[in-house]
């Protein structure tokens, strides 16, 4: 894959379309490849369309996250909005029953507690101080949507 990307970059493209470009690479090589991608997009007229199952790569290099599941568009959002605002509320049934459902995206019941994906974790932390509110990763957000 490294050779293919080097060959593509040699043609001075404005757009790279990459499918699983970092899969199969060891963590050090993957990190170096992501640095190459970041350097490439520093030029204003350069973009990369990157398809990847490695969500940590997306968190490092993406500006926008588009999630497609079973051929259907699930969401397309600014990555910073997802990482900076979305959160997971962990709570019991008493707090769960009082949650403002307009702020929730999805939830999972786990034994005696709920995990709820919310659009605004700061608002949730303020409104429900007895709940545990934590940042949501891109992977967690995707898993809640399916």
Predicted regions and their residues:
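Catalytic Walker B motif of ABC-type/P-loop ATPase nucleotide-binding domains
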Residues: 16-20
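Conserved catalytic motifs of ABC-family nucleotide-binding domains
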Residues: 12
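C-terminal coupling/interaction segments
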Residues: 104-146
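Helix N-cap at the start of a conserved alpha-helix in ABC-type nucleotide-binding domains
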Residues: 27-29
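Short loop immediately C-terminal to the Walker-B catalytic DE motif
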Residues: 22-23, 55
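ABC transporter nucleotide-binding domain
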Residues: 34-118
């Amino acid at each position: 894959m490294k050779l293919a990307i080097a060959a593509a970059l040699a043609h001075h493209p404005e757009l790279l379309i990459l499918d699983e470009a970092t899969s199969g690479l060891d963590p050090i090589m993957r990190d170096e490849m992501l640095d190459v991608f970041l350097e490439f997009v520093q030029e204003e007229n350069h973009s990369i369309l990157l398809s990847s199952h490695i969500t940590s790569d997306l968190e490092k290099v993406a500006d926008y996250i588009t999630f497609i599941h079973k051929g259907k568009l699930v969401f397309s959002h600014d990555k910073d909005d997802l990482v900076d605002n979305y959160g997971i509320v962990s709570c019991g049934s008493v707090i769960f029953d009082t949650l403002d459902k307009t702020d929730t995206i999805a939830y999972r019941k786990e034994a005696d507690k709920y995990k709820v994906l919310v659009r605004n974790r700061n608002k949730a932390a303020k409104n429900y101080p007895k709940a545990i509110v934590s940042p949501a990763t891109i992977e967690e957000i995707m898993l809640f949507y399916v």
